[in-house]
């Protein structure tokens, strides 16, 4: 019985220490805000690129030319970006509908790490963003929370 309780305590501590706290993070150039792991380092915050890095996650966000782009173009764009980056074992493309964005994502393997590749288009078709999230553990639920948190700051 003591072993069972010891196991239970150790299991609870493992879950608590591995829980990932997410905090709002903003790409200042566009006012694009999303939940990112607490303590992640911002490596670049420019007009073109927003890069974040930690021991568990590498997040890259890019603004894309959106002239004449339609919602229907996102699937080919996403597939092309993932192919260009050599993403292996690509999943089917999944549609996500956020309050301010039309979006698509696919999961795959970038080199040896699991990844999500995402395209987001503002519903007014004014901006298109490409996001890649590479992580070193199969922590899909955390990444899915991040994906669902994307929003533009109100002006």
PLM segments and residue spans:
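Sec-dependent N-terminal signal peptides
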Residues: 4-19
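Surface-exposed amphipathic alpha-helical segments
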Residues: 20, 31-34, 38-41, 82, ...
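Short, hydrophobic/aromatic-rich segments at coil-to-beta transitions
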Residues: 21-26, 48-49, 97-107
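Secretory pathway targeting signatures of secreted, lumenal, and periplasmic proteins
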Residues: 30-75, 109
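Signature of long, low-cysteine stretches enriched in small and polar/charged residues
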Residues: 38, 78-125
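Short, surface-exposed coil-to-beta transition loops
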Residues: 45-47, 112-119, 130, 142-145
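Short, well-ordered beta-strand elements
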Residues: 61-62, 126-135
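Extracytoplasmic/secreted envelope proteins and their assembly/folding machinery
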Residues: 71-78, 143-147
